């Protein structure tokens, strides 16, 4: 797998996300409610998806009272709000593949918003399945290198079933198959605490290097606009910024 061995794409986007904490909380709450409603139990001990959602919420410092309120809302029989899980796929400029995962209570609204964003920034929305063959669907768990050493991570993953691990000076990324994700996440959380990030997502099999500043800015704007939608949970793509372009954009 490629694209997530370097932290700079993630680091750039995290800076933007930090300015939108309220939107992040909205997405986390929506996932908690959906996980509690659609899982086999609203008890995280018996509901892996809810357990994973709670870990993600805590990694983003979602207040406990808001977590509890979300679970109570899911348990409330009078709450008829239901979210549909929808995946959108398409291409951004420069042939970059994009996968958008959404939780929405109005699929027509969300489809229109996503399509409009692709069109506005020079991309094209395709059919579901049009680009997912360029990615691997798997679990991802990330720890900062200043929190856990490479030696400790390598030692830990010997005890559980993981697909791959990449490390650099900034971050360790552990990849798992979907079936083992919850088990590995629970094991690592017990050993090293809540990770920097954890999710089931789409990781590019290969990446396309963006070495032009204008192309990079247009691509990043599309990703940013997509992520700004309350309905969109995550955006995945197969681009990688070159070192020079990354440095220019960070310094802008």
UniProtKB/Swiss-Prot annotation:
Xref: SUPFAM superfamilies: YebC-like (SSF75625)
Domain of life: Bacteria
GO cellular component, one term: cytoplasm
Keywords: Cytoplasm, DNA-binding, Transcription, Transcription regulation
Protein name according to UniProt: Probable transcriptional regulatory protein A1E_02520
InterPro entries: Integrase-like_N (IPR017856), TACO1_YebC-like_2nd/3rd_dom (IPR048300), TACO1_YebC_N (IPR049083), Transcrip_reg_TACO1-like (IPR002876), Transcrip_reg_TACO1-like_dom3 (IPR026564), YebC-like (IPR029072)
Family membership: Belongs to the TACO1 family.
Compartments where found: Cytoplasm
An annotated Gene Ontology molecular function: DNA binding
GO biological process terms, semicolon-separated: regulation of DNA-templated transcription
């Amino acid at each position: 797998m490629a694209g997530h061995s370097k932290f700079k794409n993630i680091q750039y986007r995290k800076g933007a996300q930090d300015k939108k904490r309220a939107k992040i909380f909205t997405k986390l709450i929506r996932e908690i409610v959906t996980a509690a409603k659609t899982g086999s139990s609203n008890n995280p001990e018996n509901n892996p998806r809810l357990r994973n959602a709670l870990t993600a919420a805590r990694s983003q410092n979602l207040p406990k009272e808001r977590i509890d309120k979300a679970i109570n809302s899911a348990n409330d029989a009078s709450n008829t709000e239901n979210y549909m899980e929808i995946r959108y796929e398409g291409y951004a400029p420069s042939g970059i593949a994009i996968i958008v995962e959404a939780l929405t209570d109005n699929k027509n609204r969300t489809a229109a918003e996503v399509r409009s964003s692709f069109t506005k920034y020079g991309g094209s929305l395709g059919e579901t399945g049009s680009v997912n063959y360029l990615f691997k669907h798997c679990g991802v768990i990330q720890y900062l290198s200043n929190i856990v050493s490479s030696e400790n991570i390598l030692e830990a993953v010997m005890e559980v079933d993981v697909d791959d691990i990449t490390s650099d000076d900034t971050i360790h990324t552990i990849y798992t198959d979907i079936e083992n994700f919850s088990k590995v996440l629970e094991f690592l959380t017990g050993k090293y605490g809540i990770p920097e990030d954890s999710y089931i997502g789409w990781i590019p099999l290969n990446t396309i290097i963006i070495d032009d500043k204008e192309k990079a800015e247009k691509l990043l704007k599309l990703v940013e606009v997509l992520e700004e939608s309350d309905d969109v949970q995550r955006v995945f793509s197969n681009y990688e910024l070159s070192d020079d372009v990354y440095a220019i954009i960070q310094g802008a």
